[in-house]
Amino acid sequence: MLNSAYIDLNQLRQNVNNVRKNLSKITRFCAVVKADAYGHGAPKVANAIYSRVDCFAVALLEEGKELRNSGIDKDILILTPLAFSDISTAVFYNFILSVDNFKTLKMIESECAKQNRKARIHLKFNTGMNRLGVNSLKELNQLSQHVQRSQYLILDGMFSHLGNPENKKDTKTAQNKFLLANNLIKGYNNKAICHLSASGGYLQNIGGDMVRIGILLYGYKPFKSNFVNVKPIMKVYAPLIKTRTIKADEHCLYGQKRADKTERVSLVRCGYADGFARQEKSFLFNNRCMDISAVKRANNTNRGVLIMDNADLLAKQYGTISYEVLVNSTKRAEKIYLQ
């Protein structure tokens, strides 16, 4: 028995429309569907919003291939560095490739020569997050020169990422660095796509040639903001296995918690292997097992027992973020799409 994840594609499209309203007509909308669209199913999500966005972004080569094989023929940007063994396939599939070092750049160029193809490159620039990207304008300029001189490489863009978009000082510092990089890249190609904003930057009304929208697609925000209205698109239900009576001073499942009085407990087919934390404070009788939970107040519907309709609430209980809850919540769930 699998859990059931009901995913509302109409609400997904509405979220996209709402985000789009705050963008200028010339700003490109890049839908981030990495990690299986944050647990929502990348092929279905991408095809549902295909006509409403300009391109897609993924983290891994395999994720890009999955989109291509599902019929997505729009641009796909791979956000993270490629393994050297993946370069040949990435060139063949015509993905946009992110690069921040000469070794990778030269290997891509060599593979393009073998295949007699060209590859579009987005150079990664570090504006303060200190994760990926070259650190200086000098390095960025050297990479740009190499791309520009190559008959097999196209300087299609440059990008960075805000590490702390809620902090105005950090964000302003990053913007200033990015502007210098933007001016450098535009000097080589004034049509290059330069992008800094993900969902957090978008909520701060930081534009650019393109915005990369991830968590907002799925109805959540990286921090509180009234800039745009989005709603969650997924609810997860677990099958009810049985209901049993626990007498006073008895316990159920693992843990030392015992019943204060005789009470009814519902056992549902949902455990920490399904991506839900062992210790959830809201309605569990005791700690979750790997595959089963004991629920004190189960409302069994024709879909099963609702175990998640708001990832923010669970994230608060777990001491984590909605992103982590979402990507884990459909590990063992059948995805059911509402058109």
Regions found by a protein language model. Give the residues of each.
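Short secondary-structure boundary segments
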Residues: 60, 101-102, 125, 162, ...
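Short hydrophobic/aromatic-enriched beta-strand-loop microsegments
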Residues: 73-82, 96-100, 118-124, 211-212
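Preference for bulky hydrophobic residues occupying beta-strand positions
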Residues: 31, 123, 268-270
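Active-site loop/helix belt of alpha/beta enzymes
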Residues: 21, 35-48, 91-93, 105-111, ...
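A charged N-terminal "starter" segment
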Residues: 1-96, 109, 154, 336-339
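Active-site anion/phosphate-binding pocket segments in diverse small-molecule metabolic enzymes
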Residues: 2-8, 13, 82, 102-103, ...
